[in-house]
Structure formats: C-alpha cells, structure tokens
C-alpha cells in the first residue's frame, strides 16, 4: 500500500486544532487525517516550556504508531515550545507548525494597532519575540494574553453572554483606539471569531490556519506523498480525555 494513503496527523492541546483540520479537509479532500486533542492536559498555554514539550512528544509518539506520513502541530503553544526539537527528531516525515499570522495583518496596511490574541506562553516565547521583531518597525503590535479563553472553548462555550463578557473585558482598554486587525494566535480562537466580530465591528480578524495548510500542501508535494486520489479521505478524531462529550464537541466544531 502506498505511503500516499497513510494519514496525516494533526495535534493540539484540545479541540482548537480542529480549526486547522477544517481548513486541511477543505484544501486536501483526498487525504486521510487523524486528529488528536490532548484535552486531558489542556490548556498548554499556562504550562512551562518543558511540560508542553513532553506532552507534545507523548502525543506524537502515539500518532507515529498509527503510521502518519506527516505531522501538523496545530497548536501555537506546542509549536513555540517544541517544533525545532520535533523536526530534529523526526526527520523522515514533514513536520509543520503554526505561528500567529502577523505578516498578512501587516500587509493590510491599515491604520492602528495590530492586536495579537494568544496564550501567555506563546507570547512569552523567543519564537514569538523573533516574529514580532520582524514586523514591529512597520506596525504597532500589541500583545493580548488571553488566559481562560481556551478553557471556555474546551467547555463548548463559543457564543453567548459568558463569551461576550470575557471578550468585552479583554478589549475594554482598546475601545477608543484605532485597530488595524486582530490576529488569532491560538487555534482555539477561530471558533469565537463571530463573537469577536460582533464586538470589534469592521476590524479584520486573521488566523494562521490557511497559511499552515498551504505549507502542508507544499511539503506533501515536495516529499511526493500528496494523495490525489478520487475518493474522499477519512477523518478519525481521538482525544486523551476519552469522553464522549469532548468527541461530540470536536465533531460539532468540525461541522462537516
């Protein structure tokens, strides 16, 4: 059996990476995917780098036993903490990470602040500092740590008064400012895009899933393992919580 038929592994600290999986299924309809959410240990964003690195490697080892042909780390925090080490250790498969989509936000050339919403760990890591340094000459970039937001989404709260209250509280310091764009620096956050848009009217909201999947496509092509069959691929969703509720939420968010 050809390696091309082997699944692509997509991992995250919980249900957030489903936003990347969704984009991947759209762009790569003939690929098979295995998604693994580590909700038992979520959120990663408030843990130490070493903890996140260890958790990430544990999940990857599980997926390698299922013969994945490529790995997508669909978690900004895990990418910040472990992507270089993963690429170093697993040289035989393409390993794709995700980072906040600052470049497209800067390229909009809109007046005002670019607000990066992300977990505390993503914003404090060297990888993000380097990314910021690349663009802060051109734009005013504001870091907005969002502790607690991942937990709300993991509980299935993606709309309604509780979410609105959380977001209004986060944005209150910027009500009078010109905002050029919001950048969603965590794969959980696209699921509350509608709620963000309802508060931050007419401000572009950008996430990195499209760019990540385009990079995945390029790598599959480069390794000559792109599946261009005619049969729609299969999707398997796994979660460390082993709880039907979290699996139901995952399928609901995938919304196929």
From Swiss-Prot:
It catalyses: L-glutamate = D-glutamate. GO terms for biological process: cell wall organization; peptidoglycan biosynthetic process; regulation of cell shape. It comes from the Bacteria. This is Glutamate racemase. Pfam families: Asp_Glu_race. SUPFAM superfamilies: Aspartate/glutamate racemase. GO terms for molecular function: glutamate racemase activity. It comes from Clostridium acetobutylicum (strain ATCC 824 / DSM 792 / JCM 1419 / IAM 19013 / LMG 5710 / NBRC 13948 / NRRL B-527 / VKM B-1787 / 2291 / W). Pathway: Cell wall biogenesis; peptidoglycan biosynthesis. HAMAP family: Glu_racemase. PROSITE patterns: ASP_GLU_RACEMASE_1. Its EC number is 5.1.1.3. Substrate binds at residues 12-13, 44-45, 76-77, 187-188. The active site is at 75 (proton donor/acceptor), 186 (proton donor/acceptor). Belongs to the aspartate/glutamate racemases family. Provides the (R)-glutamate required for cell wall biosynthesis. Keywords: Cell shape, Cell wall biogenesis/degradation, Isomerase, Peptidoglycan synthesis. PANTHER family: GLUTAMATE RACEMASE.
């Amino acid at each position: 059996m050809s390696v091309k038929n082997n699944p692509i592994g997509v991992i995250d600290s919980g249900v957030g990476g489903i936003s990347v999986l969704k984009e991947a299924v759209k762009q790569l309809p003939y690929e098979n995917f295995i998604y693994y959410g580590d909700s038992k240990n979520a959120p990663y964003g408030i843990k130490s780098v070493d903890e996140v690195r260890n958790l990430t490697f544990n999940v990857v080892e599980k997926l390698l036993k299922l013969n994945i042909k490529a790995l997508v780390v669909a978690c900004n925090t895990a990418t910040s903490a472990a992507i270089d080490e993963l690429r170093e250790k697993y040289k035989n498969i393409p390993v794709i990470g995700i980072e906040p989509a600052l470049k497209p936000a800067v390229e909009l050339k809109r007046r005002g602040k670019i607000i990066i919403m992300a977990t505390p760990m993503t914003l404090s890591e060297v990888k993000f500092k380097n990314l910021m340094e690349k663009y802060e000459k051109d734009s005013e970039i504001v870091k907005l740590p969002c502790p607690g937001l991942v937990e709300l989404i993991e509980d299935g709260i993606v709309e309604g008064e509780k979410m609105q209250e959380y977001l209004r509280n986060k944005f209150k310091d910027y009500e009078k400012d010109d905002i050029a764009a919001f950048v969603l620096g965590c794969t959980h956050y696209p699921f509350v895009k509608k709620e963000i848009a309802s508060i931050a009217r007419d401000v572009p909201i950008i996430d990195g899933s499209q760019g990540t999947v385009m990079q995945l496509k390029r790598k599959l092509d480069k390794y000559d393992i792109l599946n261009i069959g005619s049969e729609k691929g299969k999707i398997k969703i796994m979660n460390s919580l082993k709880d039907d509720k979290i699996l139901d939420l995952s399928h609901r968010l995938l919304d196929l």
